[in-house]
Amino acid sequence: MLKDQLEPLLLKVQKPIRYVGGEFNSVVKDKKNIRTRMALCFPDNYEIGMSHLGLKILYSLINAREDCWAERVYAPWPDMEALMRENHIPLYGLESLDPLREFDFLGFSLQYELSYTNILNMLDLAGIDPLAENRTNDDPVIFAGGPCAMNAEPLCDFFDCFQLGEGEEIMLEFTDLYRKAKREGWSKQEFLIAAAQIEGMYVPSLYEVKYHEDGTIESVMPTH
């Protein structure tokens, strides 16, 4: 278990409490009763991410469903990241300590552009290919929301889809669709095509974007 691998490392880092979970009001569920697992990822350190109200709202909303489990993930500080890489420990959810590869969804909060490199680093630390085109049906669906999702194109190569607007209005419909896809054995592409019909959902792989020489967008054309 990751817990056994983590414990010796916690004595070597600043603020080990960042990496163990167990806070008051954190939600731990029995995995046997869970159909959909989601990691809510904040691409900054624990102190910044844990106080973010939007993350708390989505965490509460998803965990209100008995068969869904949302966990939290934050970017580790460089001292912990170095030890995780040295000891081959993948990035994990705080509640279960399970690797992110085992989740159905990874949802990233895009609050400011300076966090974008942290997103790629977190995916790499999780052992997940950052490029969407290289991922398979066995990888989690990786999506993003938040204020910077309104300018999605700089990150379109890395995400399967973007939630534009208020996440709590889209999230439950999104998870309901995934449960149907899982039950009926859809491929990831089939799920994304259906997800694109949800108002506020943008799936970059279903569009061709052309640019002017100065880097501004010339046109956005659907490919499906």
Q: PLM features: what roles do these ranges have?
A:
Residues 9-39, 46-47, 210-224:
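N-terminal [4Fe-4S]-dependent radical SAM core
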Residues 25-28, 58-59, 95:
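Short secondary-structure capping/turn segments at boundaries of alpha-helices and beta-strands
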Residues 75-222:
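Glycine-rich beta-alpha loop elements in corrinoid/cobalamin-binding modules
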Residues 38, 42-43, 49-61, 67-84, ...:
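Low-complexity, highly charged intrinsically disordered N-terminal segments
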Residues 1-15, 65:
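Helix-enriched interaction subdomains in cytosolic or periplasmic regions
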Residues 50-67, 168, 199-210:
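Internal hydrophobic scaffold segments of catalytic domains
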Residues 31-33, 63-66, 194-196:
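A generic structural signal for short, non-catalytic loop/turn and secondary-structure boundary residues
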Residues 36-38, 44, 49-65, 110-115, ...:
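General detector of N-terminal leader/presequence modules that precede the first folded domain
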